[in-house]
């Protein structure tokens, strides 16, 4: 039987919430408040995917933070060109990092199956006790509560009262750190032409849609 995710709030501006799932837990990091290390600027500007990977990994039992995760990416693929690659991850890059830790992960696109089928696939995965890292965008979703721009969020699972618990790393969200969603919200938030090109690692703006499907973890 799958366990329901729980959460609590803290007084730490960098980690204002903690999420609990079974025997594991993770802080919800706020990327704009990360200040440590030489890559802090990357994390502040484009660290949503790195925060999501670190949070999902911790819920799978791998102790890592966004800085350690970003450093691992740099050791595997080189330091990204901030003007060209921005330092954000493609969904294929997320899978490569999860695989490095021995965590099952599958990248999927939205453009072939459509956003309705993709949202249902995400909901089904959450019901199975998996987590999903997905790209949210305000283009299709007026007043998107997750972020006014393109942004990775982590869908943790269904709560006991039937809501989808979202871990959100940006101060630009309407509710800081912890949010709730349902099928309709996810369907509106998904990028309609999101891809899952398996050859990508860092995101490439020139082929941006190929970066932005979603990843099922676990």
Predicted regions and their residues:
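Mixed-charge, low-complexity intrinsically disordered regions
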Residues: 12, 91, 217-218
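Active-site-adjacent substructure of cysteine-protease-like catalytic cores
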Residues: 114-171, 175
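Mid-length scaffold segments of soluble, non-membrane domains
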Residues: 79-83, 87-111
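Noncatalytic regulatory segments and standalone regulatory/sensor domains
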Residues: 18, 45, 146, 158-218
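Solvent-exposed, acidic/flexible segments
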Residues: 41-50, 87, 91, 115, ...
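Extracytoplasmic/secreted envelope proteins and their assembly/folding machinery
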Residues: 49-57, 91, 95-98, 119, ...
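Cysteine-dependent hydrolase recognition
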Residues: 55, 59-85, 107, 189-209, ...
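Active-site-adjacent structural segments surrounding the nucleophilic cysteine of cysteine proteases
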Residues: 1-88
């Amino acid at each position: 039987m799958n366990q329901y995710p729980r959460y609590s709030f803290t007084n730490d501006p960098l980690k204002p919430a903690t999420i609990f799932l079974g025997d594991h837990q993770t802080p919800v990091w706020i990327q704009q408040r990360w200040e440590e290390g030489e890559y802090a600027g990357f994390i502040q500007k484009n660290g949503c995917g790195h925060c999501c990977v670190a949070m999902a990994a911790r819920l799978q039992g791998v102790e890592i933070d966004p800085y350690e995760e970003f450093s691992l990416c740099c050791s595997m693929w080189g330091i990204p060109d901030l003007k060209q690659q921005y330092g954000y991850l493609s969904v294929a890059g997320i899978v490569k990092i999860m695989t490095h830790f021995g965590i099952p992960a599958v990248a999927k696109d939205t453009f072939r199956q459509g956003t309705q089928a993709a949202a249902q696939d995400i909901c089904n995965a959450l019901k199975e006790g998996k987590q999903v890292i997905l790209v949210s965008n305000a283009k299709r979703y007026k007043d998107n509560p997750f972020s006014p721009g393109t942004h990775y969020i982590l869908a943790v699972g269904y709560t006991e009262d039937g809501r989808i618990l979202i871990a959100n790393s940006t101060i630009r969200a309407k509710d800081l750190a912890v949010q709730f969603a349902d099928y309709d919200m996810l369907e509106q938030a998904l990028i309609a032409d999101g891809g899952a090109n398996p050859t990508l690692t860092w995101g490439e703006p020139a082929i941006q849609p190929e970066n932005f499907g979603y990843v099922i973890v676990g």
